[in-house]
Amino acid sequence: MAVGKNKRLSKGKKGIKKRVVDPFSRKEWYDIKAPAFFEVKNVGKTLVNRTAGLKNANDSLKGRILEVSLADLQKDEEHAFRKVKLRVEDIQGKSCLTSFNGLSITSDKLRSLVRKWQTTIEADQTIKTTDGYLCRVFVIGFTRRRANQVKKTTYAQSSQIRAIRQKMFQVIQNQTSSCSMRELVQKLIPEVIGREIERATGSIFPLQNVLVRKVKILKAPKHDAQKLLELHGESQDVGTKVVKDVAPLESV
């Protein structure tokens, strides 16, 4: 066996052991405040690095997009399949004031609606609210059986699909053209647009599960601190409750 120097035994430690720094010690929590047209205003908290040197914590928070379940905002599990996007517009103390920045439904809900023996009909319309928001509304619906129908399938003809899509365009335009963003959200929560489409298209072909699949904000108006404060109302944890219009649909 060769005799030599054991490098592992004689090798010393290089330098001093580095001190472990907790990364959360450099961060601080901010409260997230939702607009007043949601029932719950105090949504949760978000992390951000503390203000240090030229880096301001407020600048890091402004423009941040947060995704929240509508069930948490409305205290109602019926809305668990909807997701709402909130955008941080301004900082007041340790509170982030947000604005509505979009709506969508979960992928598992969408997949559960697509079935055999029916036709899927989709439409989208670009609208502008009275307070300057340019957004695109996506709607989806599915055909259903007529009254006393024996046939298994419920496929719609191409002419019927075109006619239904035109009705969807008309309903979206009529329901959204003369309302602000606050009024639009209050129509989206109880699904007013979907039920109105079902009523309007009943004479062409009966539909079911008509939903506003997505709302995308294309352009928002210039930030106005006064309007943002009006949007949030008084600084309380509970906002206004949206009344559900649960009028039953007439049988076709």
Curated annotation (Swiss-Prot):
In-chain residues carrying the UniProt-annotated modification N-acetylalanine: 2
PROSITE patterns named among the record's database cross-references: RIBOSOMAL_S3AE
Keywords attached to this entry: Acetylation, Cytoplasm, Phosphoprotein, Ribonucleoprotein, Ribosomal protein
Pfam family, one: Ribosomal_S3Ae
Organism: Schizosaccharomyces pombe (strain 972 / ATCC 24843) (Fission yeast)
Any single biological process term in GO: cytoplasmic translation
Gene Ontology molecular function terms on file: structural constituent of ribosome
Name the UniProt record assigns to this protein: Small ribosomal subunit protein eS1B
The organism's place on the tree of life at top rank: Eukaryota
Miscellaneous comment text of the record: There are 2 genes for eS1 in S.pombe.
Primary role: Component of the ribosome, a large ribonucleoprotein complex responsible for the synthesis of proteins in the cell. The small ribosomal subunit (SSU) binds messenger RNAs (mRNAs) and translates the encoded message by selecting cognate aminoacyl-transfer RNA (tRNA) molecules. The large subunit (LSU) contains the ribosomal catalytic site termed the peptidyl transferase center (PTC), which catalyzes the formation of peptide bonds, thereby polymerizing the amino acids delivered by tRNAs into a polypeptide chain.
Location of this chain's protein in the cell: Cytoplasm
Family membership noted in the UniProt record: Belongs to the eukaryotic ribosomal protein eS1 family.
Organism placement in taxonomy: Eukaryota, Fungi, Dikarya, Ascomycota, Taphrinomycotina
Subunit structure of this chain's protein: Component of the small ribosomal subunit (SSU). Mature yeast ribosomes consist of a small (40S) and a large (60S) subunit. The 40S small subunit contains 1 molecule of ribosomal RNA (18S rRNA) and at least 33 different proteins. The large 60S subunit contains 3 rRNA molecules (25S, 5.8S and 5S rRNA) and at least 46 different proteins. eS1 interacts directly with uS11 and eS26, which form part of the mRNA exit tunnel.
Modified residues annotated as Phosphoserine in this record: 251
Any one of the GO CC terms: cytosolic small ribosomal subunit
